[in-house]
Design a protein with these regions (language model features):
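Soluble "head" domains of membrane/secretory-pathway proteins
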Residues: 2-30, 38, 45-53, 87-270
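Small-side-chain structural scaffolding
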Residues: 63, 67, 72, 84, ...
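Membrane-bilayer interface helices and TM-boundary transition segments
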Residues: 76-85, 126
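Transmembrane alpha-helices and immediately adjacent membrane-cytoplasm interface residues
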Residues: 47-79, 100
Length: 270
């Protein structure tokens, strides 16, 4: 079952707001009149107490509304659940995603009301997964509309241009089950965006050639090239599925060693 926090938060704001407004318009005046009659002549009257439901609604509504507006239009926190973007993003990284970088979208409906920047080569994009839009994915933008993408012998080609890779060395990559895999770490220069990638020669990489990215679509891949479910397998990301651009790591928890990765805190995502 997928946990749709955005929808739950929306209903929480709506219900608490309706209760608080109904009380303000119809119940508060009568309650104060009854209180005034009951405490008339008292030198030290007790504090006027609200019904518990109304008290909770009035207390939580402004907080819920503020959180809803911040995460809908400014920044939203996400947790990285898999290693598909390693070594750039580690499992257990908590990141902030800029929600307005690619335009303002209505919460819940996700309709664009104010277009802004379009995704560029090398951007790390959070989006609603096309096969199941209730699930959020995060990948790197490899192809923008009109690009011709090829992937041959684990090397990228964009519009016929080979994307240069330089060797960093051999390292171990741990998967979600804790198993270690020996991988090659390389530095990829992707149109000026330099970032490390993992290549696992023990895993088969299916080649493809001259895949053209359609209008209003994007081709995305993980930096952990042989351990990423991405556009190579399920297709393109439509513009309307975009959630935002990953910006910073604000927390990182190593679930295997049970500790905070202090060195990753505040790291810029690129």
């Amino acid at each position: 079952m997928n946990f749709n926090f955005e929808l739950i938060l929306f209903y929480a704001v709506l219900i608490s707001g309706i209760i608080a407004l109904f009380d303000q318009l119809f119940l508060m005046k009568k309650r104060k009149q009854v209180y005034a009659k009951e405490t008339k002549g008292m030198s030290n009257p007790p504090e006027l107490k609200l019904p518990i439901l109304i008290d909770y609604a009035r207390s939580f509504f402004p907080v819920l509304l503020l959180v809803f507006l911040l995460r809908s239009f400014l920044y939203e926190p996400f947790r990285i659940p898999t290693g598909s973007l390693e070594p750039t993003l580690a499992v257990g990284d908590f990141i902030l995603v800029n929600k307005f970088h690619y335009g303002v979208r209505l919460p819940v409906l996700h309709t664009v009301v104010y277009p802004n920047n379009n995704p560029k080569h090398g951007d790390i994009l959070v989006f609603r997964w096309p096969p199941n839009p209730s699930v959020n994915f995060i990948k790197r933008v490899i192809g923008v509309p009109g690009d011709k993408i090829s992937y041959i012998d684990k090397t990228l080609y964009v519009n016929g241009q080979k994307i240069n890779q330089s060797d960093i060395g051999i390292t171990n990559n741990r998967d979600e089950e804790g198993r270690l895999w020996e991988v090659k770490e390389k530095m990829e220069d992707f149109f000026g965006v330099k970032h490390a990638i993992y290549i696992n020669d023990a895993r088969y990489g299916e080649d493809f050639k001259d895949v053209v990215v359609p209008e209003d679509m994007y081709f995305v891949m993980g930096d952990n090239r042989d351990s990423s479910a991405d556009s190579r397998f399920w297709g393109f990301v439509p513009y309307e599925n975009i959630v935002g651009k990953a910006n910073y790591v604000w927390m990182s928890w190593d679930s295997f060693d049970h500790k905070i990765r202090w060195s990753r805190l505040g790291k810029s995502v690129n």
